[in-house]
């Protein structure tokens, strides 16, 4: 639960119905169903997810079935918070889909909340964003607008990640990486998933490989 202190900080001014920290990579369907039951039992009317792609993915799984809106506070550069794409894993088979219900209503980007993300994880996460950008250039619905966003995302990530490697506390580098991650997600959501991303989903779901590192 490395993000719990950050979550406590983020939610300090709101009434929290329940805290839920049972987050698992690739969102196993059992984990998703348990989280849905917690949300319904506690009459949750807003999901605030603080963390990386797995945390956002779990919130999306809850929203998919319940329609509860999401406020996402990302602490990595995965970009999932800015897409309408969901993913669930059952018996080592990962299924993904698109639904407007899983697109967060609000996303809060704060570079200071990413300062505790280790350099190695920061780079892997940023390369996941880079993969979103590359897929956006040739995915099924790629177009000039997607390409422009993806190109800017690549430039931002390429500028920010080396600064983070050089100084993990570089706000400038973290700002650029978050900006690039957002652009990568928006372009990816519009263009659709290319073969590269689908392969990573299959490998990740089958062999339980971490998504960001698989891309990297």
Residue ranges with predicted function:
Residues 1-46:
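ATP/NTP phosphate-donor binding region
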Residues 3-6, 29, 54-61, 79-83, ...:
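Short glycine/serine/threonine-rich phosphate/pyrophosphate-binding segments
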Residues 12, 37, 60-64, 190, ...:
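Short, well-ordered alpha-helices that flank and scaffold nucleotide-derived cofactor binding pockets
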Residues 17-18, 45-48, 69-71, 105-107, ...:
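Structural motif
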Residues 39-62, 66-77:
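A short, small-residue-rich loop immediately preceding and capping a beta-strand
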Residues 64-148, 152-153:
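A glycine/threonine-rich phosphate-anchoring loop and its flanking beta-alpha core
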Residues 136, 140-216:
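Active-site segments that bind and position negatively charged phosphate/pyrophosphate groups
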């Amino acid at each position: 639960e490395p993000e719990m202190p950050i979550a406590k900080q983020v939610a300090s001014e709101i009434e929290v119905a329940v805290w839920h920290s049972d987050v698992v990579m690739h969102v196993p369907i059992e984990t998703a169903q348990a989280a849905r039951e917690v949300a319904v039992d506690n009459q949750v009317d807003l999901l605030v997810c603080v963390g990386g792609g797995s945390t956002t993915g779990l919130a999306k799984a809850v929203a998919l079935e319940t329609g509860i809106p999401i406020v996402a506070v990302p602490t990595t550069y995965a970009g999932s918070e800015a897409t309408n794409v969901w993913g669930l894993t059952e018996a080592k088979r990962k299924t993904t889909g698109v639904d407007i219900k899983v697109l967060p209503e609000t996303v809060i980007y704060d570079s200071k909340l990413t300062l505790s993300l280790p350099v190695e994880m920061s780079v892997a996460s940023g390369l996941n964003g880079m993969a979103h950008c590359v897929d956006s250039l040739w995915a099924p619905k790629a177009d000039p607008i997607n390409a422009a966003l993806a190109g800017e995302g690549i430039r931002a990530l390429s500028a920010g990640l080396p600064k983070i490697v050089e100084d993990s506390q570089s706000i400038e580098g973290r700002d650029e990486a978050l900006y690039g991650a957002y652009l990568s997600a928006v372009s990816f959501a519009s263009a659709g998933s290319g073969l590269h991303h689908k392969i990573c989903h299959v490998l990740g779901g089958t062999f339980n490989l971490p998504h960001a590192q698989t891309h990297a």
